[in-house]
Design a protein with these regions (language model features):
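Alpha-solenoid helical-repeat scaffolds
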Residues: 63-131, 141, 147-150, 155-167
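Canonical pleckstrin homology
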Residues: 4-87, 155-156, 160-164, 171-173, ...
Length: 358
């Protein structure tokens, strides 16, 4: 990342935005990462490079003329463009017209990626990506929307707002009358820290987590297939108002530690806690640490202070464990795999996503 600095020969502001293949951002704001320079510190035109990372630093070069500095900037921008093209995996598409004042807190696509629910501080909005010239439409006037997910097979939208989890069936959402849509919602949990939906034991499950400093209560729920039950019992559909009783409790359990994430394995849950990744057997509710304490090669994990487990991904029979400091592989027995492979982050990650094999 680089920035232009005003000098005695006059101010000139330039900024460049790029993204490396490792995801760290090289975007500029004036004066970031470097002390202010006096205008008479040197003669010439300054060009400041700032490295964004835990060990970040700034380096300022001086060009004798404005033309030579612009030439440097031109070549840097060209090189950045080529690097972005080489590492490009996804195409970025705007979800709202340019100039729309949006502060999106969360988003979840559905309908094969053709539509997306957007979480805003003032509610849930719906955007049709096939017509991005139109602004998002308010469908649920909920305050402080923090998290959303979609159970598309069951046509259910889950929303976490102000620490309360709600469910809404798709057919209850009416963009022409958002207030009426709210009346069809179902409040399924309060005092919620976060929730997660996924597949485990061949079931679609929703885990709702109430996490405290010393313990966590985790309630797992599964969807009620309203349409299937209505076909078998015609009166059931008439008795069940739209959006009501969409989930039922499957299991509920307690762990004596603070939790920050949940991940679904084939037959077990993996929970990220301040102690590390914990495995919970949903059939017996037995809990054990994911990492085997007998593996001496994992001592570097146990020695690391303030380590936070964030995500786990299954790749070719192994598990990629992502923490806030580093990532590494383990096998199904919790022993280190690919012993020479360790990825340390330059920045401070708060979330991960994997699109295998990219």
């Amino acid at each position: 990342m680089y920035e232009d600095v005003a000098t005695s020969k006059g101010p000139r502001t330039r900024a460049v935005l790029s993204r490396s293949s490792f995801g760290h951002r090289t975007c500029l704001a004036p004066g970031v990462g470097s002390p202010p320079l006096r205008q008479d510190a040197k003669s010439g035109y300054a060009l400041t490079f700032t490295y964004l990372g835990k060990q970040g630093y700034s380096l300022t070069l001086w060009a004798s003329t404005l033309a030579s500095r612009d030439k440097w900037i031109e070549h840097i921008e060209l090189r950045q463009h080529r690097l972005r093209q080489q590492s490009c995996v996804f195409d970025l598409l705007p979800v709202a017209p340019r100039g729309t004042p949006v502060v999106v807190t969360c988003a979840v696509p559905f309908d094969g990626g053709r539509q997306v629910f957007l979480g805003f501080p003032d509610g849930v909005y719906l955007q049709d990506l096939r017509d991005r010239s139109r602004s998002p439409t308010l469908v649920l006037p909920l305050r402080h929307v923090l998290q959303m997910d979609v159970l598309e097979e069951f046509q259910i939208l889950l929303v976490l707002a102000e620490h309360v989890v709600y469910t809404f069936t798709f057919d209850a959402l009416d963009p022409s009358d958002p207030v009426a849509s709210m009346r069809h919602g179902r409040r399924i949990a309060s005092h919620t820290s976060f929730f997660r939906a996924g597949m485990c034991l061949g079931r679609t499950l929703v885990c709702v987590v109430k996490s405290g400093a010393a313990s966590s209560t985790i309630k797992t729920l599964e969807p009620i297939d309203v349409h299937a039950r209505a076909k078998k019992h015609p009166t059931f559909g008439k008795m069940l108002p739209s959006g009501q009783d969409t989930l039922r409790v499957f299991k509920e359990f307690y762990i004596p530690t603070e939790s920050s994430s949940i991940h679904f394995l084939k037959s077990k849950l993996c929970i990220g806690t301040i102690k590390g990744f914990e495995i919970v057997d949903l059939e017996t509710l037995d809990t054990q640490g994911l990492l085997d304490p007998a593996d001496a090669s994992l001592e570097f994990v146990r020695r690391q202070e303030n380590l936070q487990p964030i995500a786990i991904f299954r790749i070719d029979g192994e598990f990629l464990l992502c923490y806030n400091e580093f990532a590494f592989y383990v096998n199904k027995n919790g022993w280190r795999a690919r012993a020479s492979w360790l990825l340390r982050w330059e920045g401070t990650p708060t979330a991960f996503a994997l699109h295998y094999p990219y």
